[in-house]
């Protein structure tokens, strides 16, 4: 099971991935080699982890009511199509095995 515990500051994008532009800028200023591959600065979210799992997993999105009112709507397309686009790399992430998604609310 993959658990995604929602807080009042959680954004839907965090469940997909986060791009660390600040670290990439710092590395470019330091002349780091890793700066040439943008994938080094992508942190996979819980939805991405569930989509790329080798076997069927359960994704628990816990206490969705704590987030902004638009939070559930922001994930509808990704959960319906079981895929999303990573703009920084041009990659489309598709579910290998469709996860079982459980969403809880208080």
Regions found by a protein language model. Name each.
Residues 1-106:
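AAA+ P-loop NTPase catalytic core and its hallmark functional loops
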């Amino acid at each position: 099971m993959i658990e995604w515990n929602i807080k009042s500051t959680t954004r839907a994008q965090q469940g997909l991935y986060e791009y660390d532009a600040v670290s990439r800028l710092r590395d470019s200023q330091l002349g780091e080699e890793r700066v040439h591959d943008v994938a080094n600065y992508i942190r996979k979210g819980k939805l991405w982890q569930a989509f790329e799992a080798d076997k069927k997993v359960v994704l628990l999105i816990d206490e969705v009511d704590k987030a902004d009112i638009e939070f559930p709507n922001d994930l509808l397309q990704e959960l319906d199509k079981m895929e999303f686009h990573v703009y920084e790399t041009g990659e489309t992430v598709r579910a290998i095995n469709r996860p079982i998604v459980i969403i809880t609310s208080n």
